[in-house]
């Protein structure tokens, strides 16, 4: 594993942190939202991969989920003192209470939601997500969603992305951000 945690060039705007279960649209929405707000986009999982020098799947295979979660916390800590970013977190980033505190300190937390059926249709054929390799039944995913619900609820804004265009979700978040800066 290599690298250091750094997020350069802070701007004047407050960060927007997107949380939610896999398949809710965090990365897709985040990229467009960053452009709309004139912010930079950061994907927490991409920061972890860059720092570790190996893929998330490899981190899980070689070191296990616990080590991945430790790297995730380090990446979240790197958000401190940085502003003007839209950050897409991994689906499990909010599991640890300390991460939720760090994310709230980093900026406005927006939780994206969708029903299990919508998520399953969005993730159909996706084999890159480590948790889908072992917990890929609808029942297992439903249990995981339920287990994380209280952590996801710890947000400044919650948006159900089902049946909405990416543009509509971005507009809703951008309006909220402007009202809360």
Swiss-Prot record:
Residues annotated to bind substrate: 45, 69, 91, 148
Record localization: Cytoplasm
Catalyzed reaction equations: shikimate + ATP = 3-phosphoshikimate + ADP + H(+)
Entry binding sites for ATP: 23-28, 129
Keywords, alphabetical: Amino-acid biosynthesis, Aromatic amino acid biosynthesis, ATP-binding, Cytoplasm, Kinase, Magnesium, Metal-binding, Nucleotide-binding, Transferase
Cofactor note: Binds 1 Mg(2+) ion per subunit.
One GO term (biological process): chorismate biosynthetic process
Keyword Ubl conjugation among UniProt keywords: no
Main location: cytoplasm
Pfam families hit by this protein: SKI
SUPFAM superfamilies: P-loop containing nucleoside triphosphate hydrolases
Molecular function GO terms recorded: ATP binding; magnesium ion binding; shikimate kinase activity
Cofactor(s) named in the record: Mg(2+)
EC number: 2.7.1.71
Family according to the record: Belongs to the shikimate kinase family.
Function: Catalyzes the specific phosphorylation of the 3-hydroxyl group of shikimic acid using ATP as a cosubstrate.
Complex formation: Monomer.
Protein name: Shikimate kinase
